[in-house]
Protein backbone atom coordinates (compact mmCIF):
# COMPACT_ATOMS: atom_id res chain seq x y z
CA UNK A 1 0.00 0.00 0.00
CA UNK A 2 1.40 3.38 -1.03
CA UNK A 3 0.92 6.08 1.61
CA UNK A 4 0.89 9.85 1.09
CA UNK A 5 0.27 13.01 3.11
CA UNK A 6 -1.36 16.06 1.49
CA UNK A 7 -2.41 19.48 2.73
CA UNK A 8 -4.69 20.30 -0.23
CA UNK A 9 -8.00 21.97 0.76
CA UNK A 10 -10.68 19.28 0.89
CA UNK A 11 -12.82 20.91 -1.78
CA UNK A 12 -9.92 20.68 -4.26
CA UNK A 13 -8.76 17.20 -3.31
CA UNK A 14 -9.13 14.79 -6.23
CA UNK A 15 -9.58 11.27 -4.91
CA UNK A 16 -11.73 8.21 -5.53
CA UNK A 17 -13.02 8.38 -1.96
CA UNK A 18 -12.68 10.96 0.79
CA UNK A 19 -13.56 9.66 4.26
CA UNK A 20 -14.51 12.17 6.95
CA UNK A 21 -15.12 11.23 10.58
CA UNK A 22 -17.94 12.42 12.81
CA UNK A 23 -19.19 11.99 16.36
CA UNK A 24 -22.53 12.35 18.10
CA UNK A 25 -22.41 15.20 20.62
CA UNK A 26 -25.85 14.49 22.10
CA UNK A 27 -25.83 13.53 25.80
CA UNK A 28 -26.00 9.86 26.67
CA UNK A 29 -29.37 8.24 27.23
CA UNK A 30 -30.93 8.80 30.66
CA UNK A 31 -31.65 5.20 31.61
CA UNK A 32 -33.51 6.20 34.79
CA UNK A 33 -36.07 8.29 32.91
CA UNK A 34 -35.97 6.27 29.70
CA UNK A 35 -35.07 9.29 27.58
CA UNK A 36 -32.79 9.31 24.55
CA UNK A 37 -31.61 12.56 22.99
CA UNK A 38 -31.67 12.83 19.21
CA UNK A 39 -28.24 12.48 17.58
CA UNK A 40 -26.30 15.70 17.09
CA UNK A 41 -23.73 14.96 14.42
CA UNK A 42 -20.47 16.88 14.51
CA UNK A 43 -17.88 16.51 11.78
CA UNK A 44 -14.36 16.18 13.14
CA UNK A 45 -13.01 18.16 10.18
CA UNK A 46 -13.90 21.83 9.85
CA UNK A 47 -14.29 22.86 6.21
CA UNK A 48 -16.88 25.16 4.62
CA UNK A 49 -17.18 23.17 1.37
CA UNK A 50 -17.55 19.93 3.30
CA UNK A 51 -20.23 21.42 5.55
CA UNK A 52 -22.20 22.52 2.49
CA UNK A 53 -21.87 19.11 0.83
CA UNK A 54 -23.30 17.21 3.81
CA UNK A 55 -25.81 19.76 5.12
CA UNK A 56 -28.85 18.08 3.57
CA UNK A 57 -27.78 14.57 4.58
CA UNK A 58 -27.18 15.58 8.19
CA UNK A 59 -30.48 17.45 8.35
CA UNK A 60 -32.32 14.34 7.13
CA UNK A 61 -31.14 12.28 10.09
CA UNK A 62 -30.03 9.45 7.79
CA UNK A 63 -26.55 9.54 9.33
CA UNK A 64 -26.28 9.39 13.12
CA UNK A 65 -22.50 9.04 13.59
CA UNK A 66 -22.90 5.79 15.48
CA UNK A 67 -19.66 3.91 16.01
CA UNK A 68 -18.40 2.55 12.66
CA UNK A 69 -21.54 3.64 10.77
CA UNK A 70 -20.83 4.66 7.18
CA UNK A 71 -22.78 6.60 4.58
CA UNK A 72 -21.53 6.99 0.99
CA UNK A 73 -22.30 10.10 -1.05
CA UNK A 74 -21.58 10.01 -4.79
CA UNK A 75 -20.33 13.16 -6.54
CA UNK A 76 -20.59 15.42 -3.47
CA UNK A 77 -21.60 18.92 -4.48
CA UNK A 78 -18.80 21.48 -4.54
CA UNK A 79 -16.03 18.94 -4.01
CA UNK A 80 -13.48 17.36 -6.36
CA UNK A 81 -13.67 13.93 -4.70
CA UNK A 82 -15.68 11.34 -6.65
CA UNK A 83 -17.20 9.96 -3.45
CA UNK A 84 -17.54 11.24 0.10
CA UNK A 85 -17.79 8.73 2.94
CA UNK A 86 -19.13 9.80 6.30
CA UNK A 87 -17.80 7.56 9.08
CA UNK A 88 -19.20 7.51 12.59
CA UNK A 89 -16.92 7.37 15.62
CA UNK A 90 -19.67 7.15 18.24
CA UNK A 91 -20.43 9.44 21.15
CA UNK A 92 -18.15 12.45 21.43
CA UNK A 93 -17.97 11.96 25.20
CA UNK A 94 -16.47 8.51 24.68
CA UNK A 95 -14.26 9.37 21.71
CA UNK A 96 -10.74 7.94 21.91
CA UNK A 97 -7.87 7.27 19.55
CA UNK A 98 -8.99 3.62 19.56
CA UNK A 99 -12.48 4.59 18.36
CA UNK A 100 -10.76 6.50 15.56
CA UNK A 101 -8.62 3.47 14.67
CA UNK A 102 -11.73 1.32 14.28
CA UNK A 103 -13.49 4.05 12.32
CA UNK A 104 -10.54 4.20 9.91
CA UNK A 105 -10.80 0.45 9.47
CA UNK A 106 -14.52 0.77 8.81
CA UNK A 107 -13.79 3.35 6.12
CA UNK A 108 -11.33 1.05 4.36
CA UNK A 109 -13.69 -1.94 4.61
CA UNK A 110 -16.44 0.20 3.04
CA UNK A 111 -14.07 1.21 0.24
CA UNK A 112 -13.06 -2.40 -0.42
CA UNK A 113 -16.72 -3.44 -0.56
CA UNK A 114 -17.13 -1.03 -3.50
CA UNK A 115 -13.88 -2.15 -5.17
CA UNK A 116 -12.34 1.25 -4.54
CA UNK A 117 -8.55 0.94 -4.59
CA UNK A 118 -7.58 4.48 -3.57
CA UNK A 119 -8.83 6.35 -0.52
CA UNK A 120 -8.14 9.51 1.45
CA UNK A 121 -8.80 9.88 5.17
CA UNK A 122 -9.26 13.38 6.59
CA UNK A 123 -7.27 13.76 9.80
CA UNK A 124 -9.59 15.03 12.54
CA UNK A 125 -8.79 18.40 14.04
CA UNK A 126 -7.84 18.58 17.72
CA UNK A 127 -10.10 16.21 19.74
CA UNK A 128 -7.42 16.34 22.41
CA UNK A 129 -5.13 14.03 20.43
CA UNK A 130 -1.71 14.90 19.12
CA UNK A 131 -1.26 14.51 15.38
CA UNK A 132 1.22 11.63 15.73
CA UNK A 133 -1.26 9.52 17.70
CA UNK A 134 -4.05 10.43 15.29
CA UNK A 135 -2.09 9.54 12.15
CA UNK A 136 -0.87 6.36 13.78
CA UNK A 137 -4.44 5.29 14.59
CA UNK A 138 -5.56 5.98 11.03
CA UNK A 139 -2.65 4.05 9.52
CA UNK A 140 -3.00 1.11 11.87
CA UNK A 141 -6.75 0.84 11.39
CA UNK A 142 -6.50 1.13 7.62
CA UNK A 143 -3.79 -1.52 7.34
CA UNK A 144 -5.61 -4.06 9.53
CA UNK A 145 -8.81 -3.51 7.54
CA UNK A 146 -6.99 -4.25 4.28
CA UNK A 147 -7.02 -8.02 4.80
CA UNK A 148 -9.27 -10.95 3.93
CA UNK A 149 -8.67 -14.62 4.82
CA UNK A 150 -9.87 -16.15 1.53
CA UNK A 151 -6.33 -16.95 0.33
CA UNK A 152 -7.15 -20.26 -1.32
CA UNK A 153 -10.30 -19.39 -3.28
CA UNK A 154 -9.72 -19.94 -6.98
CA UNK A 155 -11.99 -16.97 -7.77
CA UNK A 156 -10.36 -14.68 -5.22
CA UNK A 157 -10.34 -11.04 -6.26
CA UNK A 158 -7.66 -8.70 -4.99
CA UNK A 159 -9.50 -5.86 -3.25
CA UNK A 160 -6.49 -4.51 -1.40
CA UNK A 161 -6.05 -0.77 -1.18
CA UNK A 162 -3.33 0.43 -3.52
CA UNK A 163 -3.07 3.96 -2.18
CA UNK A 164 -3.88 5.56 1.18
CA UNK A 165 -3.67 9.33 1.62
CA UNK A 166 -4.05 11.35 4.81
CA UNK A 167 -5.41 14.86 4.33
CA UNK A 168 -3.83 17.25 6.83
CA UNK A 169 -5.71 20.16 8.39
CA UNK A 170 -4.12 23.60 8.20
CA UNK A 171 -1.11 24.27 10.45
CA UNK A 172 -0.54 20.55 11.05
CA UNK A 173 2.98 19.31 11.75
CA UNK A 174 3.54 17.17 8.65
CA UNK A 175 6.64 15.50 10.08
CA UNK A 176 4.76 14.39 13.19
CA UNK A 177 1.90 13.10 11.04
CA UNK A 178 4.30 11.21 8.80
CA UNK A 179 5.98 9.59 11.81
CA UNK A 180 2.61 8.52 13.19
CA UNK A 181 1.45 7.14 9.86
CA UNK A 182 4.68 5.18 9.47
CA UNK A 183 4.22 3.66 12.94
CA UNK A 184 0.60 2.79 12.29
CA UNK A 185 1.34 1.08 8.99
CA UNK A 186 4.20 -0.87 10.61
CA UNK A 187 1.91 -2.09 13.37
CA UNK A 188 -0.98 -2.89 11.03
CA UNK A 189 1.11 -4.76 8.47
CA UNK A 190 2.86 -6.70 11.24
CA UNK A 191 -0.51 -7.61 12.71
CA UNK A 192 -1.56 -8.81 9.26
CA UNK A 193 1.56 -10.99 9.10
CA UNK A 194 0.39 -12.58 12.35
CA UNK A 195 -3.08 -13.07 10.88
CA UNK A 196 -1.68 -14.54 7.66
CA UNK A 197 0.29 -17.16 9.59
CA UNK A 198 -2.67 -18.07 11.81
CA UNK A 199 -4.86 -18.43 8.73
CA UNK A 200 -2.62 -21.07 7.13
CA UNK A 201 -3.95 -24.65 7.29
CA UNK A 202 -1.90 -27.31 9.01
CA UNK A 203 -0.79 -28.97 5.78
CA UNK A 204 0.66 -25.66 4.54
CA UNK A 205 2.27 -24.49 7.77
CA UNK A 206 4.13 -27.24 9.58
CA UNK A 207 6.61 -26.40 12.36
CA UNK A 208 9.42 -26.51 9.79
CA UNK A 209 7.58 -24.11 7.48
CA UNK A 210 6.78 -21.80 10.40
CA UNK A 211 10.50 -21.68 11.08
CA UNK A 212 11.12 -20.77 7.45
CA UNK A 213 8.59 -17.94 7.68
CA UNK A 214 10.33 -16.62 10.79
CA UNK A 215 13.72 -16.77 9.06
CA UNK A 216 12.32 -14.97 6.01
CA UNK A 217 10.88 -12.16 8.11
CA UNK A 218 14.09 -11.81 10.13
CA UNK A 219 16.21 -11.67 6.97
CA UNK A 220 13.99 -8.90 5.59
CA UNK A 221 14.15 -6.88 8.82
CA UNK A 222 17.77 -7.45 9.81
CA UNK A 223 17.11 -9.67 12.83
CA UNK A 224 19.11 -12.69 13.93
CA UNK A 225 17.23 -15.97 13.66
CA UNK A 226 18.10 -19.58 14.42
CA UNK A 227 15.77 -22.51 13.84
CA UNK A 228 16.55 -25.78 15.61
CA UNK A 229 14.86 -29.16 15.54
CA UNK A 230 14.85 -32.48 17.40
CA UNK A 231 18.60 -32.67 18.03
CA UNK A 232 18.60 -29.33 19.87
CA UNK A 233 15.64 -30.35 22.00
CA UNK A 234 17.52 -33.46 23.11
CA UNK A 235 20.72 -31.48 23.67
CA UNK A 236 18.86 -29.01 25.90
CA UNK A 237 16.96 -31.86 27.61
CA UNK A 238 13.62 -30.31 26.67
CA UNK A 239 11.65 -33.41 27.59
CA UNK A 240 8.44 -31.47 28.15
CA UNK A 241 8.52 -29.89 24.67
CA UNK A 242 9.66 -33.13 23.03
CA UNK A 243 6.81 -35.13 24.58
CA UNK A 244 4.29 -33.15 22.54
CA UNK A 245 6.02 -33.59 19.20
CA UNK A 246 6.88 -37.28 19.46
CA UNK A 247 3.53 -38.45 18.09
CA UNK A 248 3.89 -36.57 14.80
CA UNK A 249 5.87 -37.39 11.67
CA UNK A 250 6.60 -33.65 11.38
CA UNK A 251 9.74 -32.58 13.26
CA UNK A 252 9.49 -29.78 15.83
CA UNK A 253 10.95 -26.31 15.44
CA UNK A 254 12.62 -24.30 18.18
CA UNK A 255 12.77 -20.78 16.77
CA UNK A 256 14.97 -18.09 18.33
CA UNK A 257 14.81 -14.48 17.08
CA UNK A 258 16.96 -11.65 18.45
CA UNK A 259 16.76 -7.87 18.23
CA UNK A 260 19.79 -6.02 19.63
CA UNK A 261 19.83 -2.26 18.99
CA UNK A 262 22.85 -0.06 19.49
CA UNK A 263 23.18 1.24 23.03
CA UNK A 264 21.23 -1.62 24.60
CA UNK A 265 24.18 -3.39 26.24
CA UNK A 266 22.86 -2.66 29.73
CA UNK A 267 19.34 -2.79 31.07
CA UNK A 268 16.52 -5.31 30.82
CA UNK A 269 16.41 -8.08 28.24
CA UNK A 270 12.85 -8.91 27.26
CA UNK A 271 11.89 -12.48 26.43
CA UNK A 272 8.90 -13.13 24.15
CA UNK A 273 7.73 -16.76 24.19
CA UNK A 274 5.08 -18.16 21.85
CA UNK A 275 3.14 -21.41 21.68
CA UNK A 276 3.39 -22.71 18.11
CA UNK A 277 1.22 -25.82 17.80
CA UNK A 278 0.58 -25.76 14.05
CA UNK A 279 -2.15 -28.37 14.43
CA UNK A 280 -3.62 -29.69 17.65
CA UNK A 281 -5.61 -32.91 17.43
CA UNK A 282 -5.34 -33.32 21.19
CA UNK A 283 -2.99 -36.26 20.82
CA UNK A 284 -4.26 -39.51 22.36
CA UNK A 285 -6.65 -37.38 24.44
CA UNK A 286 -8.32 -36.72 21.10
CA UNK A 287 -10.48 -33.65 20.61
CA UNK A 288 -14.07 -33.99 19.33
CA UNK A 289 -14.37 -33.78 15.55
CA UNK A 290 -16.61 -30.72 15.76
CA UNK A 291 -14.52 -27.62 15.00
CA UNK A 292 -11.21 -29.49 15.12
CA UNK A 293 -10.36 -27.83 11.81
CA UNK A 294 -9.92 -24.55 13.69
CA UNK A 295 -7.01 -26.06 15.60
CA UNK A 296 -4.71 -24.73 12.90
CA UNK A 297 -4.98 -21.54 14.97
CA UNK A 298 -3.19 -23.12 17.93
CA UNK A 299 0.00 -21.36 16.87
CA UNK A 300 -1.51 -17.88 17.23
CA UNK A 301 0.81 -17.11 20.14
CA UNK A 302 3.84 -17.92 18.00
CA UNK A 303 2.44 -15.87 15.13
CA UNK A 304 1.94 -12.93 17.50
CA UNK A 305 5.62 -13.11 18.42
CA UNK A 306 6.75 -13.20 14.78
CA UNK A 307 4.56 -10.19 13.99
CA UNK A 308 5.76 -8.41 17.13
CA UNK A 309 9.42 -8.96 16.25
CA UNK A 310 8.78 -7.49 12.80
CA UNK A 311 7.17 -4.39 14.30
CA UNK A 312 9.96 -4.08 16.87
CA UNK A 313 12.57 -4.19 14.11
CA UNK A 314 10.73 -1.39 12.28
CA UNK A 315 10.01 0.80 15.32
CA UNK A 316 13.48 0.32 16.82
CA UNK A 317 12.99 0.63 20.59
CA UNK A 318 16.31 0.83 22.45
CA UNK A 319 16.04 -2.42 24.37
CA UNK A 320 17.21 -5.95 23.65
CA UNK A 321 14.51 -8.49 22.81
CA UNK A 322 14.76 -12.27 22.48
CA UNK A 323 11.88 -14.37 21.18
CA UNK A 324 11.57 -18.13 21.64
CA UNK A 325 8.92 -20.10 19.77
CA UNK A 326 8.20 -23.74 20.50
CA UNK A 327 6.46 -25.26 17.49
CA UNK A 328 5.12 -28.78 17.07
CA UNK A 329 2.17 -30.83 15.92
CA UNK A 330 0.16 -32.63 18.60
CA UNK A 331 -0.90 -35.88 16.94
CA UNK A 332 -1.97 -39.39 17.99
CA UNK A 333 0.14 -42.35 16.88
CA UNK A 334 1.96 -45.35 18.25
CA UNK A 335 4.82 -43.00 19.13
CA UNK A 336 2.66 -40.43 20.93
CA UNK A 337 2.90 -39.81 24.65
CA UNK A 338 0.18 -41.44 26.71
CA UNK A 339 -1.98 -40.15 29.54
CA UNK A 340 -0.13 -41.03 32.72
CA UNK A 341 3.35 -40.61 31.25
CA UNK A 342 5.92 -38.66 33.25
CA UNK A 343 8.12 -36.18 31.38
CA UNK A 344 11.22 -34.34 32.59
CA UNK A 345 11.41 -30.66 31.68
CA UNK A 346 14.49 -28.65 30.78
CA UNK A 347 14.93 -27.47 34.39
CA UNK A 348 14.61 -31.01 35.71
CA UNK A 349 11.05 -30.71 37.02
CA UNK A 350 9.00 -33.88 36.52
CA UNK A 351 5.53 -33.59 34.98
CA UNK A 352 2.74 -36.16 35.14
CA UNK A 353 0.81 -35.82 31.89
CA UNK A 354 -2.82 -36.64 32.65
CA UNK A 355 -4.22 -35.11 29.47
CA UNK A 356 -2.25 -34.93 26.24
CA UNK A 357 -4.57 -32.16 25.02
CA UNK A 358 -3.07 -29.86 27.65
CA UNK A 359 0.05 -29.68 25.52
CA UNK A 360 0.55 -25.94 25.15
CA UNK A 361 1.80 -25.60 28.70
CA UNK A 362 4.25 -28.44 28.08
CA UNK A 363 5.99 -26.67 25.20
CA UNK A 364 5.86 -23.28 26.94
CA UNK A 365 7.44 -24.71 30.10
CA UNK A 366 10.66 -25.41 28.23
CA UNK A 367 10.35 -22.29 26.09
CA UNK A 368 10.13 -20.00 29.12
CA UNK A 369 13.07 -21.76 30.77
CA UNK A 370 15.14 -21.45 27.60
CA UNK A 371 14.38 -17.74 27.23
CA UNK A 372 15.70 -17.27 30.77
CA UNK A 373 18.83 -19.26 29.87
CA UNK A 374 19.37 -16.95 26.88
CA UNK A 375 19.41 -13.97 29.23
CA UNK A 376 15.82 -12.71 29.44
CA UNK A 377 15.23 -10.68 32.60
CA UNK A 378 11.51 -10.15 31.92
CA UNK A 379 9.16 -12.58 30.19
CA UNK A 380 5.90 -12.40 28.30
CA UNK A 381 4.20 -15.35 26.63
CA UNK A 382 1.16 -15.67 24.41
CA UNK A 383 -0.81 -18.84 23.80
CA UNK A 384 -4.19 -20.17 22.80
CA UNK A 385 -3.90 -22.10 26.02
CA UNK A 386 -7.26 -22.98 27.57
CA UNK A 387 -10.91 -23.44 26.77
CA UNK A 388 -11.49 -22.28 30.34
CA UNK A 389 -10.55 -18.70 29.48
CA UNK A 390 -13.18 -18.79 26.74
CA UNK A 391 -15.80 -19.89 29.28
CA UNK A 392 -14.72 -17.15 31.68
CA UNK A 393 -14.34 -14.23 29.27
CA UNK A 394 -15.96 -15.25 25.98
CA UNK A 395 -14.68 -13.65 22.82
CA UNK A 396 -14.52 -10.11 24.22
CA UNK A 397 -11.53 -10.07 26.55
CA UNK A 398 -8.37 -12.15 26.50
CA UNK A 399 -6.96 -13.36 29.79
CA UNK A 400 -3.79 -12.00 31.35
CA UNK A 401 -1.86 -13.25 34.39
CA UNK A 402 1.17 -11.66 36.01
CA UNK A 403 3.50 -12.48 38.90
CA UNK A 404 5.04 -9.01 39.29
CA UNK A 405 3.37 -5.64 39.85
CA UNK A 406 5.96 -3.61 37.94
CA UNK A 407 5.63 -5.90 34.92
CA UNK A 408 1.86 -5.56 35.25
CA UNK A 409 2.11 -1.76 35.25
CA UNK A 410 4.11 -1.95 32.04
CA UNK A 411 1.41 -4.16 30.50
CA UNK A 412 -1.38 -1.84 31.65
CA UNK A 413 0.47 1.02 29.98
CA UNK A 414 0.78 -1.12 26.85
CA UNK A 415 -2.98 -1.71 26.78
CA UNK A 416 -3.52 2.04 26.97
CA UNK A 417 -1.53 2.34 23.75
CA UNK A 418 -2.86 -0.73 21.91
CA UNK A 419 -6.53 -0.49 22.90
CA UNK A 420 -6.79 -4.29 23.13
CA UNK A 421 -9.07 -5.84 25.73
CA UNK A 422 -7.43 -8.04 28.36
CA UNK A 423 -8.75 -8.95 31.80
CA UNK A 424 -6.42 -9.81 34.65
CA UNK A 425 -7.18 -13.19 36.23
CA UNK A 426 -5.95 -14.61 39.55
CA UNK A 427 -2.77 -16.53 40.32
CA UNK A 428 -3.52 -17.40 43.95
CA UNK A 429 -1.33 -20.07 45.52
CA UNK A 430 -4.38 -22.26 46.11
CA UNK A 431 -4.39 -23.04 42.38
CA UNK A 432 -0.99 -24.69 42.82
CA UNK A 433 -2.56 -27.20 45.21
CA UNK A 434 -4.79 -28.36 42.35
CA UNK A 435 -1.68 -29.39 40.39
CA UNK A 436 -0.17 -31.70 43.00
CA UNK A 437 0.80 -35.11 41.64
CA UNK A 438 1.33 -38.22 43.79
CA UNK A 439 4.20 -39.42 41.58
CA UNK A 440 5.80 -36.29 40.05
CA UNK A 441 6.60 -32.68 40.87
CA UNK A 442 3.50 -31.41 39.12
CA UNK A 443 0.66 -32.64 36.90
CA UNK A 444 -0.35 -30.87 33.71
CA UNK A 445 -4.05 -30.39 34.47
CA UNK A 446 -5.81 -29.35 37.64
CA UNK A 447 -9.34 -30.63 37.32
CA UNK A 448 -12.58 -29.24 35.99
CA UNK A 449 -12.64 -25.79 37.57
CA UNK A 450 -10.38 -22.75 37.33
CA UNK A 451 -8.64 -24.13 34.26
CA UNK A 452 -7.18 -20.85 33.01
CA UNK A 453 -5.65 -20.11 36.42
CA UNK A 454 -4.29 -23.62 36.96
CA UNK A 455 -2.70 -23.52 33.49
CA UNK A 456 -1.08 -20.19 34.32
CA UNK A 457 0.05 -21.54 37.69
CA UNK A 458 1.65 -24.49 35.88
CA UNK A 459 3.68 -22.07 33.75
CA UNK A 460 4.64 -20.03 36.81
CA UNK A 461 6.62 -23.05 38.02
CA UNK A 462 9.05 -22.55 35.14
CA UNK A 463 9.69 -18.80 35.42
CA UNK A 464 10.76 -18.68 39.06
CA UNK A 465 11.16 -15.12 40.32
CA UNK A 466 11.52 -13.63 36.83
CA UNK A 467 8.88 -10.92 36.17
CA UNK A 468 6.41 -12.55 33.80
CA UNK A 469 3.18 -11.81 31.94
CA UNK A 470 1.07 -14.63 30.50
CA UNK A 471 -1.53 -13.97 27.79
CA UNK A 472 -4.22 -16.60 27.23
CA UNK A 473 -5.74 -15.66 23.86
CA UNK A 474 -7.75 -18.82 23.17
CA UNK A 475 -11.08 -16.96 23.02
CA UNK A 476 -9.98 -13.98 20.94
CA UNK A 477 -7.42 -15.21 18.40
CA UNK A 478 -10.15 -16.25 15.95
CA UNK A 479 -13.33 -14.35 15.05
CA UNK A 480 -16.22 -16.27 13.54
CA UNK A 481 -17.93 -13.04 12.50
CA UNK A 482 -16.52 -9.97 10.79
CA UNK A 483 -16.46 -6.56 12.46
CA UNK A 484 -17.08 -3.34 10.52
CA UNK A 485 -13.35 -2.59 10.81
CA UNK A 486 -11.94 -6.10 10.40
CA UNK A 487 -12.64 -9.32 8.50
CA UNK A 488 -13.62 -12.55 10.17
CA UNK A 489 -10.94 -15.15 10.82
CA UNK A 490 -7.64 -14.54 12.61
CA UNK A 491 -7.58 -11.37 14.70
CA UNK A 492 -3.87 -10.90 15.36
CA UNK A 493 -4.70 -10.34 19.04
CA UNK A 494 -1.83 -9.63 21.46
CA UNK A 495 0.71 -8.56 18.85
CA UNK A 496 0.09 -4.80 19.30
CA UNK A 497 0.09 -5.10 23.10
CA UNK A 498 3.32 -7.10 23.11
CA UNK A 499 4.99 -4.44 20.98
CA UNK A 500 3.77 -1.69 23.31
CA UNK A 501 4.91 -3.71 26.35
CA UNK A 502 8.39 -3.80 24.85
CA UNK A 503 8.32 -0.10 24.02
CA UNK A 504 7.19 0.77 27.56
CA UNK A 505 10.52 -0.51 28.89
CA UNK A 506 12.43 1.57 26.36
CA UNK A 507 10.73 4.88 27.16
From Swiss-Prot:
It is found in: Cytoplasm. Its EC number is 3.4.11.1, 3.4.11.10. It holds the Pfam family Peptidase_M17. Its cofactor is Mn(2+). GO terms for cellular component: cytoplasm. Binds 2 manganese ions per subunit. Mn(2+) 1 binds at residues 280, 357, 359. The keyword RNA-binding does not apply. Its main location: cytoplasm. It is an enzyme of class 3 (hydrolase). Presumably involved in the processing and regular turnover of intracellular proteins. Catalyzes the removal of unsubstituted N-terminal amino acids from various peptides. Belongs to the peptidase M17 family. This is Probable cytosol aminopeptidase. The gene is pepA.
